[in-house]
């Protein structure tokens, strides 16, 4: 497939913020094994570590995420 690699994360994937995203930090996709981390950028304000986020854009391995209101 096009642009599919180890870091391919589809839009709509839910993930856990492992670090604060200010605006860049680390996330782990909820559907992937523990220990698989991705760098992501928050689209809006600071996202706290432990928050659930959703991938809104994935482009050349660069992930843009938005916090999911619980």
Predicted regions and their residues:
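Terminal membrane-proximal soluble interaction domains of membrane-associated proteins
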Residues: 2-70
């Amino acid at each position: 497939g096009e642009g599919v690699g180890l870091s391919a994360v589809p839009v709509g994937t839910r993930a856990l913020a492992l670090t604060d995203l200010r605006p860049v930090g680390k996330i782990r996709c909820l559907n992937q094994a523990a220990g698989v981390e991705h760098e992501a950028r928050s689209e809006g304000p600071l996202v706290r570590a432990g928050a659930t986020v959703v991938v809104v854009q994935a482009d050349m391995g660069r992930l843009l995420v938005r916090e999911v209101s619980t």
